[in-house]
Amino acid sequence: MLYIVRSQYWFYFIAIFVALSLYFSNSIHAQEKTKLPNYVIEQYGEPPAIPTTQNLESIQSAVKVAFIDGVRQSNWGRDQTLALEEIANSKDPRYVWIISDLMRFSSGHQLDMELRDAASKLLQKKIPIENQWGVVTDHLIAWNIPAPPNYLEAKRTIFTTIIPGWDKIFVEGEIDWRHVSWGGVVIDDRKYDTTDERCNCIPAADNPEVSNVKDAAWLKDDDIVFGVEVNGEYRAYPRRIMEVREMVNDTLGGRDLGIPYCTLCGAAQAYFTDQMPEGVKRPILRTSGLLIRSNKVMYDINTYSVFDTFLGKAVTGPLAKKGIKLKQASVVTSTWGAWKKAHPKTTVLKEALALGRDFDFRNNRDSDGPIFPVGNVDPRLSVHEDIIGVITASGKPVAFQRSKAFLALKKGKEIAFENIRLRLAGDGIKAVDANGSDLGSHQAFWFAWSQFYPTTTLWNG
């Protein structure tokens, strides 16, 4: 009998403990008190505190009603409004991440207003009507507000319900889903070597047709190209074409390459996609239609493994589990005239690959900063300053301000940092070691390089 009584008391103890665990969130969920840089506080103010106790079960139920049920049913009614009010009254700014995700797709005045008011209450900030999604998301990133519980589930529901084709993309992995947003286009999910087929996407080009210099009369000498050299073979990828395609799967010098161009961060990169571990097929890279802090998100069409485009590292799927990280070849940003003079036997992509378009994104870039949210930007250089980025042999990221480095090299000065030596190539710049071997450098906007390499060294000239 005593055993039964004690067992009953033990049962009640467990029941009470579980109930309390569901009702209260403890300090584990509190925002880490990591000191923010002064420039972040000056621009965005102090972040709101995250409550250490709250009714998590009730809030999660409200999230389901407002964001999961509402999106799946394509309905925003009284139940959703009341659920959103409950979330706003929680004083927990973590839930603004989900509000931000729905903001990105919202086009209704009433819903926009309700989402803005809820975000404003939780962030303790007045949110402007204009660009409310951008302002909210910039604050979340800059303050490094943690994700709410079960965040990926809610985000996945919003994104995959509204835009088809992302079901295999939104999975757990080494990716910070807080920073993933919609780039305004749908996924390119065409199989390898079918890129002549039309798509309602940013259309990659597989095995693009090329010509020699003589037959490339359509290119002006001052047109910008991205030059790549592999095993003594040279190829120019005109920016006009890359602004349309944004992704090329090619073969040069006997090596397979995947070449993404992120128009938003001014970075063309060249990744080797051959010489994979046994059992791993060549990754065929595509544009997902998603962004991470204004940097395009690419993925492998064979496995739906997502890659960090800037780092070349697989972050989800089978390739992430195998630890795949792609090595880079240098990409030189040069004028066509200087590139062909330096490399008269170069090949170049054919004009037809531009599909008759000429976006000229670069020269129409917003002078006020990135057009998608990026949060705080390292203030050592201006946001859209061009840099040459490279990693040293010791693993240290280094950025060279392109304008200063170019002038120094033109004057015959040597630029060296650890094992890095900068060299002129056409009228662009590439990094090599003391033996002249390629170190996989590329040009990018400062905001992009510094956010993916926050500890980067900046060459001071």
Language-model-detected regions and their locations in the chain:
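N-terminal secretory signal peptides that target proteins for export/translocation
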Residues: 1-8
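A composition/secondary-structure signal for short, hydrophobic, low-basic-content segments
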Residues: 4, 25-27
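Bacterial N-terminal signal peptides
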Residues: 12-23
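Boundary at the C-terminal end of the N-terminal hydrophobic targeting segment
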Residues: 28-32
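Mid-to-C-terminal functional-domain signal that highlights helix-capping/loop sites
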Residues: 34-74, 78-81, 96-461
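Alpha-helical segment of the N-proximal tetratricopeptide repeat
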Residues: 82-86
